[in-house]
Amino acid sequence: MRDERTIKLLSALREIMKLYDVFQKQSIINKFDCNIEFEQLGIESVLTIAEKDPNILFEIGAQAWMLFVESGAKVNPQKLASDFNQRNPLIYQKVEKVIKRKVIQDLSFSYALLDDPKVHSRGCIQLLLCRMYPNDLFIADVAFYNPYKPVASKDKKYDLHHFRSLNLFGIHLDQIKQYCRANKISRITLTTSSNEQIPYFESHGFKIENNTFAKSAFEHGWSVPMYLTCT
């Protein structure tokens, strides 16, 4: 049972800490000598996000649909097949109509771009978070790579392993946990881009979802849904 002091602290954090505060700008700045341009988009910019990162927004809707179907709800899993085939970035709106619940409760899409013409840093540093149905904090995408340190083909641990890590995931996960505890969010979730990433996320406490979709995704090498319970 939480003591009164802990309850008051969490209440204060809930008032002070916003989802966009999870992104640790100073920790990123400390990694480089050049100037860094930051961009953060929230729920009020969902249509901008649909244009900038349509695949990520699609994944949020797909994640909600997967959880709804796997919850045992009496619904045809193929009901939104056309939206899935088209990878409709606004599929979450269709999901909301079916489940009669709000899918996206808050968004924080954070990007960092290095002001150095010698490197192409777009996509190397970003953290895309969504507070969503049913009561999860979904890490829609995460990348903390050093564009100055490319990885040789023989050293790649997975297909998208193009640069060395900045080793910033751990401190961001700590911030995510803090945000979740303050806001009574029960789980942190994500989907891997390949099976090779599973051990890395397992080392941070994530587990593969225990459902039919996750088992099938693992067997076929698709994006595997994982979760971490917040305590």
Where would I find each of the regions flagged by the language model?
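Non-catalytic substrate-recognition and accessory regions of acyl/acetyltransferase enzymes
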Residues: 1-164, 171, 178-189, 193-198, ...
